[in-house]
Regions:
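Hydrophobic alpha-helical transmembrane segments of multi-pass membrane transport/permease proteins
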Residues: 25-51, 70-83, 190-202, 291-301
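Aromatic- and glycine-rich beta-strand/loop motifs that create alpha-glucan
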Residues: 1-35, 245-246, 256-287
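Interfacial/capping segments of alpha-helical transmembrane domains
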Residues: 48-58, 299, 303-327, 469-472
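Membrane-interfacial helix-loop-helix connectors in multipass membrane proteins
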Residues: 50-67, 134-161, 206-209, 381-396, ...
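Transmembrane helix boundary and interhelical loop/hinge segments in multi-pass membrane proteins
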Residues: 84-104
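A structural motif at transmembrane helix-loop-helix junctions in multipass membrane proteins
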Residues: 24, 28-31, 90, 145-193, ...
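Transmembrane helix segments
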Residues: 35, 42-50, 166-219, 223-226
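Selective transmembrane-helix segments that form parts of the transport pathway or gating/packing helices
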Residues: 78, 83, 108-139, 292, ...
Length: 475
């Protein structure tokens, strides 16, 4: 086993060194990366100094204190985006230059080719990113600006490394699917824009000063980087690289593929409900079970956390605000409740789970699901803190519609997790596009056949039944 691993690493390094050697001999690649990497940290140092002077003058040094690690993150991020062009042309660039045939005809395995390109593609962005961080820190030292604490430094360096791997994995995946360098460069926006949004979220956490959530971001980015690398390895096919000359947007084929998977073998609407939906549920039963288990764990963890920190939570609110919380059907909150409002709100949550899950292999969709389940667990100690019986309120205020709403949430979340699993599973007879379309069709089966009816029933009960039961229970 060790011998096999050593052989794999040697082959991966062989591909990586070939790629790095080509990069290092081209001054048109090296000069812009190094020049921009040195200039940006210099400007960031000047900005940090000006911000510190300005905020100190008006008595708000906390802003400057949080700005220094924020600029450190920015300095680490931008060189990666500049160097991303190397990864974007890793396969398709060689195809246009006519140098890919010898590489693909070698006895190297597909995963060795992909991982070798990934290693070489990550090296340049990380080198320029670390170089920019070093220049930035030297500038801080020369201007007598305090360094960020060790925890923030570690978080920034880890996030920079993981984000580089995540972006390069996506770029190489694009390079294996694109038919030209021009197309791969245009598709780079699907990497840069989401990563820029991620950086904005991390920046909010930095200015907020919550280190625990930043470590959760580290875990999340690690999972996404691993999944995206896995997708690249799972769907890398050297034969497709040689055979694909141009891709035309075939809307008819997309619709036919979707409809064939969505309809299945059903001959009627009744047959579709009777056979296809439950066939899909059976196919996803393990994922559904996992979703139920992690949802229960989220509820228990939230309940324990809220029970242990209930005094701190209550101290945030004034006593009169807690006592004024609406609890009955005659409250202003209850008066605004309507069937369309509740149904639309629940549907919105399901759509958000779908959209976030599509861009994160189900990870962000599962996170929204866990947050919803966590809220259910956390609300019981809070109900007790305001002097209401938690068990009675839960039995009459949540259970009537919850027995329909929670299964709908579980099914929708499990379906989007299954989509992510389908994408990272190797399927030699299916292209990445076919796998994605079929997985979306499976989600739509669950969504239209089960989730939507369950949400409709839950909204009706929550509108007309739950308020009556809750009003009777609290009298």
């Amino acid at each position: 086993m060790i011998k096999s691993l050593k052989g794999d690493l040697e082959m991966i390094w062989l591909v990586a060194w070939r790629e790095l050697r080509d990069q290092l001999r081209d001054w048109r690649i090296i000069f812009p990366m190094v020049f921009l990497t040195v200039i940006l940290p210099f400007l960031a140092d000047l900005g940090a100094k000006a911000a510190i002077n300005f905020t100190t003058k008006y008595g708000t040094p906390l802003i400057a204190e949080r700005l220094v690690p924020f600029l450190l993150m920015v300095v680490g991020f931008f060189p990666v985006t500049v160097s991303l062009v190397i990864a974007l042309e890793s396969f398709v660039g060689e195809k246009e230059r006519g140098t890919i045939e010898p590489l693909l005809s070698s006895p190297l395995e597909d995963r060795q080719l992909f991982l070798g390109k990934l290693l070489a593609g990550t090296a340049a962005p990380l080198f320029t990113s670390y170089l920019g961080i070093i220049v930035y820190l030297i500038g801080l030292h020369l201007q007598n600006i305090p360094f960020p604490d060790a925890n923030r430094m570690a978080q920034t360096l880890i996030l920079t490394t993981l984000q580089a791997i995540l972006m390069v994995s996506g770029a190489i995946l694009i390079s294996t699917q694109a038919t030209s360098v021009r197309a791969s460069n245009l598709m780079a926006s699907f990497i840069v824009i989401p990563m820029a949004l991620l950086i904005q979220g991390e920046s909010i956490m930095l200015f907020w000063g919550n280190d625990q959530i930043l470590w959760l971001a580290v875990i999340g980015v690690t999972i996404l980087a691993a999944l995206l690398s896995r997708v690249g390895i799972a769907h890398f096919q050297r034969e497709a690289l040689l055979g694909r000359e141009i891709d035309v947007l075939n809307v008819r084929w997309i619709l036919q593929t979707f409809w064939r998977s969505f309809k299945g073998e059903a001959k009627s609407v009744f047959g579709w409900f009777r056979f296809e939906i439950f066939k899909t549920v059976k196919k996803q039963r393990r994922v559904i079970l996992i979703t139920v288990v992690i949802g229960l764990l989220a509820m228990i963890a939230a309940y324990i956390w809220m029970s242990m920190n209930i005094k701190d939570v209550i101290s945030v609110f004034r006593e009169e605000n807690l006592s004024a919380l609406p609890t009955g059907v005659d409250s202003p909150l209850a008066e605004g409740i309507s069937f369309p409002l509740i149904w639309g709100h629940n549907l919105q949550a399901i759509v958000i789970i779908l959209l976030l899950g599509l861009f994160s292999f189900g990870v962000l969709g599962a996170l929204i699901y866990l947050l919803n389940m966590g809220v259910i667990g956390a609300i019981f100690p809070l109900i007790g803190a305001i002097g209401k019986p938690p068990l009675k309120m839960g039995l009459f205020g949540m259970l009537p519609h919850g027995i329909f709403e929670i299964p709908a949430l579980i099914l929708a979340s499990a379906a989007i997790l299954y989509l992510g699993i389908a994408l990272v599973t190797p399927r030699s007879q299916r292209t990445l596009g076919e796998v994605l379309i079929e997985a979306i069709a499976d989600w739509m089966k669950i969504g239209l056949g089960l989730v939507l009816p369950l949400l409709t029933i839950a909204a009706a009960i929550e509108t007309w039944v739950t308020p009556v039961l809750l009003s009777w229970a609290i009298k």
